Amino acid sequence: MGSVNSRGHKAEAQVVMMGLDSAGKTTLLYKLKGHQLVETLPTVGFNVEPLKAPGHVSLTLWDVGGQAPLRASWKDYLEGTDILVYVLDSTDEARLPESAAELTEVLNDPNMAGVPFLVLANKQEAPDALPLLKIRNRLSLERFQDHCWELRGCSALTGEGLPEALQSLWSLLKSRSCMCLQARAHGAERGDSKRS
């Protein structure tokens, strides 16, 4: 999905944003769009918005509801995903195991093979927010060796960390494009006719 520019980098990309309920996904979506804080209700289904990222990349960002009954449908949004953004509430240590399990399930889906992901530890402005190193360890992010990934702290409330999150999306998208081009080149060397 998406188009590639002359440098081999995607000019358009599909970004799926997932995470448990109350992580702040919808608030982040609209803050990334440059809006003031908006009052949100729990997302039933999805929200979709276009977004510009560094490098003149047009993103289509899908914000998928995170309540437990809706998670069974998450797999329906994964086909054609270029980048996954996984949002968690960094003040809710009790739900980190549940969040880790859901992230693992998403990344184990066949549609997610090699798809890079960005974990956004939201609500970092709160005094009880967990440090990123603790979140990284609790999610065991190092085990996802078949994916490029980044972990960023942010605040949908203050906007802190969101410019860096957009830069991370661009970096991960470039890594995905490079991996696809390398796979094609490697396939051509072997005489493989498959296309990535």
From Swiss-Prot:
Role played: May play a role in apoptosis. May act as a tumor suppressor.
Tissue: Expressed in lung and leukocytes.
Family annotation (PROSITE patterns): ARF
SMART domains for this protein: ARF, SAR
Lipidated residue numbers (N-myristoyl glycine): G2
Keyword Lipoprotein: yes
Sorted UniProt keywords: GTP-binding, Lipoprotein, Myristate, Nucleotide-binding
Gene3D superfamilies per record: P-loop containing nucleotide triphosphate hydrolases
Gene: ARL11
Protein name: ADP-ribosylation factor-like protein 11
Sequence similarity: Belongs to the small GTPase superfamily. Arf family.
InterPro entries in alphabetical order: P-loop_NTPase, Small_GTP-bd, Small_GTPase_ARF, Small_GTPase_ARF/SAR
GO biological process terms on file: hematopoietic progenitor cell differentiation; intracellular protein transport; vesicle-mediated transport
Involvement in disorder: Leukemia, chronic lymphocytic: A chronic leukemia in which functionally incompetent B-lymphocytes progressively accumulate in the bone marrow, blood, and lymphoid tissues. The clinical evolution of the disorder is heterogeneous, with some patients having indolent disease and others having aggressive disease and short survival.
Residues bound to GTP: 19-26, 63-67, 122-125
CDD domains, per the entry: ARLTS1
GO-annotated molecular function: GTP binding; GTPase activity
A GO cellular-component term linked to this record: cytoplasm
